[in-house]
From Swiss-Prot:
PROSITE patterns hit by this protein: HOMEOBOX_2
Species, as recorded: Solanum lycopersicum (Tomato)
Chain intervals with Basic and acidic residues compositional bias: 1-11
Function noted in UniProt: Transcription factor that plays a central role during developmental processes such as early embryogenesis and flowering, probably by regulating expression of specific genes. Required to specify stem cell identity in meristems, such as shoot apical meristem (SAM). May induce shoot stem cells activity in order to maintain the stem cell identity.
Database matches in SUPFAM superfamilies: Homeodomain-like
Location(s), subcellular: Nucleus
Name assigned to this protein: Protein WUSCHEL
Length: 272
């Protein structure tokens, strides 16, 4: 009885070892076989080959190594499954990025669109400086010319009046920034034209002509009048004889003799 049991156990062990040897045999594709299979999949559009196609493909691949029909079938099935999984991962990652961008858009200080960055990266001016508008007479705006990123900055400022106001007050932005390329010849740059400057210059020229005309008329009118001196030459004796003395009864006032004072009054009254 025991002998029969041992025989049965020996038969079971032999069957298990056979199954293990059979399952351990795996297909190890060569580089040439993988190259041909990928060429069929990507370039020839073979996704789900038929049984006849599998037989012909396996017969072709046996020239480069050991292979069976089931190996060809499973290779196509696994390749399609990996491709579908890759597409799902890409779609999930794209959806996650879109959700992150949408959530960041709800918080303005964390994210800005490229248009907003371009909008807020322009040159700004100091709100504490108040300059009159270019249309006001006799006032020129501030013109600043600079090039960014090249290490040089040239500024030209021309103004007559620029008042300083406390921060937060109203101001007029009269600053103009003009980018300059240092690699271009500066002599070939055409000068900028300012229409309001030409208007101010014309008005200033008209005012200058009016002032010159008034001065000429004034000089012409003065030449027709006779110049009279305050103290005529023939009255020098009166001035020389004029003396000042202190009188005790005058209350501290200085006065001259009566004759000299009368002569001085006649001289002064002779002028219109």
């Amino acid at each position: 009885m025991e002998h029969q049991h041992n025989i049965e156990d020996g038969g079971k062990n032999s069957n298990n070892s056979f199954l293990c040897r059979q399952s351990s045999s795996r297909w190890t594709p060569t580089s040439d076989q993988i190259r041909i299979l990928k060429d069929l999949y990507y370039n020839n559009g073979v996704r789900s080959p038929t049984a006849e196609q599998i037989q012909r493909i396996s017969a072709k691949l046996r020239q480069y190594g050991k292979i069976e029909g089931k190996n060809v079938f499973y290779w196509f099935q696994n390749h399609k499954a990996r491709e579908r999984q890759k597409k799902r991962l890409i779609a999930a990652a794209s959806a996650t990025d879109n959700n992150n961008i949408s959530s960041m858009q709800m918080i303005p200080h964390l994210w800005r669109s490229p248009d907003d960055h371009h909008k807020y990266n322009t040159a700004t001016t100091n709100p504490g400086v108040q300059c009159p508008s270019p249309s006001s007479h006799g006032v020129l705006p501030v013109v600043q010319t600079g090039n960014y990123g090249y290490g040089t900055l040239a500024m030209e400022k021309s103004f007559r009046e620029c008042s300083i106001s406390p921060p937060g007050g109203s101001y007029h932005q009269n600053l103009t920034w003009v980018g300059v390329d240092p690699y271009n010849n500066m002599s070939t740059t055409s000068p900028a034209t300012y229409p309001f400057l030409e208007k101010s210059n014309n008005k200033h020229y008209e005012e200058t002509l009016d002032e010159e005309q008034e001065e000429e008329n004034y000089q012409r009118g003065n030449s027709a009048l006779e110049t009279l001196s305050l103290f005529p030459m023939h009255e020098e004796n009166i001035i020389s004889n004029f003396c000042i003395k202190h009188h005790e009864s005058s209350g501290g006032w200085y006065h001259s003799d009566n004759n000299n004072l009368a002569a001085l009054e006649l001289t002064l009254n002779s002028f219109p």
